Amino acid sequence: MSFKVNWNSLETEPLTNWTKELLTSALNSGKSPNILASNITIKDLNFGKIAPDFEILEIGELDRDRFRGIFKIDYQGDFHLTLHTKVQANPLNIYYHNSLEKEVCNYSQDEFITPNFLLSNEQFAIPLDLKLSDIKINGIGIIVFSKSKGLTLVFRNDPLDSIKVSSTFDTVQVLANFLQKQIENQIRDLFRETLPTLIHQLSLKYLSLDNNINEIKSKLSQQDSVSMTNNELASSLKLFDDEENEFPLIYSSKNLQKNMQLFKSRETFRLSVPKFKNIVQRTRLDKFTKSYPNLLNSLYANNADLQHRFVNNINHGHNNNSNTSSNGIPIELLVSHDDKQHYDKTDDLLKDISSIQANNFYKYSNKDAPNKPKRRRIKVHKKSKAKQDDNTVKASELQNVDSTFMDSRSISPQETIDTTSTLIESAPMTRNVSTNIKSPTLETMSTGSSSSASSQVIAHPTPKRAYQPADTTVSTTTINKENHIDYIKARNLYQDFIQMSQSPGYYDKVISNGGGIGLGNSGGNYFGFNGNGNGLERTMSASPIKHLNKDKKSINYIDTSKINEKLNQFRLDGGKNSANTNNSSGGKNFRPGFTRNESNGQQGILFEAFNFPSVAPPPPYC
């Protein structure tokens, strides 16, 4: 199998330039010999008019992604190549550098003392033009192609038959023969090692591009059901399949070189790192943040006095904790009361801040929108009328409470309070305790039967409360003695009152059951009056408590309204029974009235103790 190659298509400027760049990088790669004083450049490149003969001898494997074959190449054309460089003409300089490489190969040259001869260190460079022409190639090679591993080319024999080398030193026969031998050896190495390596790397570059295009196509086809229609998918695939597209999808060598330059510039410990456009480097991040527009910089632009004042404060150490790069302003400008640091344009400063914030708000929002930026407003030295009214009401209440106190005592830490009291506890520190018992008050009520007759009404007593009156000192023994006497008097009076009530059975029943007389007992109401008015015993519910403690009424609560109703009834019954005292004194249904002091001896003692002829005593709160 054989085929013809259109050799005239190679005579294009892009291909010629690309080949020059490729050969230049290949010739200058690695360490250059000491005889060369400069790099090698391509001066002239011409592929000629005669095409080589290319013949495939055998195909060992053929598939869509794999190929293996043996080919034969024969070329006897007019290809020529001209190289330009500079060579070192000073033999002492060449010998000096060669000896350094032999003696000091793995060490630094600065560690050894070398003779500093002026003649040997001087360079004498001579330009050299080297032309390669009349190339004859005849060889058999093996080609192995794979999409994953690229293209591999290996020659079985030495393909170079002959080559003509001409240079500027052709007049010197010794140099001409030397150059001829050296260049032939280098070209043989080129066909044996360099050319297969270059072809393999070039194939990997373009194969990776094809693989990337295939991956993009597959991803676009997978997104068809998600975010793209059929028309959009067809247009996107056409972008990659169209060979005549003005913007082909290829890797730009300039971008790759820029990225490589950026990468290599960071592999150094130098302090002077090169700058790049549109790139923020971490070493210069502080300068970038200072120049970035923020609130403080905007205020500096509008107020030159502010900038001068704040910079001076920083330089003199007045504002060491302030960070000029942060998006904020020094708090000393707003709250400082020092004459040296006080800023007298605070109102103007706040207006500038408000305008800057408003401009930023309208910059990133729709200007036609009616919404305005919401601001937080704080009114200083202004109190609401409701709070002032509450304060006046509380002050008046405190004054009224002070006027109603009957007794105040000061207790020291060593003093103790009788444990029989249920409303006052001992204090671990010095405090003032105010004892105030509100006795039952009398209210006159006009009745239809008698306008002059006045009725007494029982009011709910007020318990003791802790208060802070004027300091008065009372001894411990006096307090305990007075509390004990008051407690005995109140207990005797209360028991006498219960015995004289209309339901003595309740009292006897509570005593017989072992219950005590006091607030919260389950023996029933104190005065024998229930809500239904029948005088029966109140039963305690065994069901669990359904309400919280805050929803319950206190167990010390006494319904005084019902007591007043019974007292009025007693007065009416007492008035009727006063006319028939001798007849009804021995009857079974006789109910003693509170106005009859002669019916029971204990009753007179009860009323005289409270100085009220018809008022019931309070419970024992002491």
Swiss-Prot record:
PROSITE patterns with a match to the protein in the record: SMP
Segment forming the signal sequence: none
Bias (Low complexity): 446-455
Region entry Disordered, spans: 364-393, 442-468, 572-592
GO molecular function: lipid binding
Localization terms from the record: Mitochondrion outer membrane
Domain SMP-LTD, residue spans: 1-204
Membrane topology per record: Multi-pass membrane protein
One GO CC annotation: ERMES complex
Comp. bias (Polar residues): 577-587
Coiled-coil spans in chain: none
Composition bias, Basic residues: 372-385
Keywords, alphabetical: Lipid transport, Lipid-binding, Membrane, Mitochondrion, Mitochondrion outer membrane, Transmembrane, Transmembrane beta strand, Transport
GO biological process, one term: phospholipid transport
Domain remarks: Lacks alpha-helical transmembrane segments, suggesting that it resides in the membrane via beta-sheet conformations similar to those predicted for other outer membrane proteins and porin. The SMP-LTD domain is a barrel-like domain that can bind various types of glycerophospholipids in its interior and mediate their transfer between two adjacent bilayers.
Function: Component of the ERMES/MDM complex, which serves as a molecular tether to connect the endoplasmic reticulum (ER) and mitochondria. Components of this complex are involved in the control of mitochondrial shape and protein biogenesis, and function in nonvesicular lipid trafficking between the ER and mitochondria. MDM34 is required for the interaction of the ER-resident membrane protein MMM1 and the outer mitochondrial membrane-resident beta-barrel protein MDM10.
Protein family membership: Belongs to the MDM34 family.
Complex formation: Component of the ER-mitochondria encounter structure (ERMES) or MDM complex, composed of MMM1, MDM10, MDM12 and MDM34.
Protein's recorded name: Mitochondrial distribution and morphology protein 34
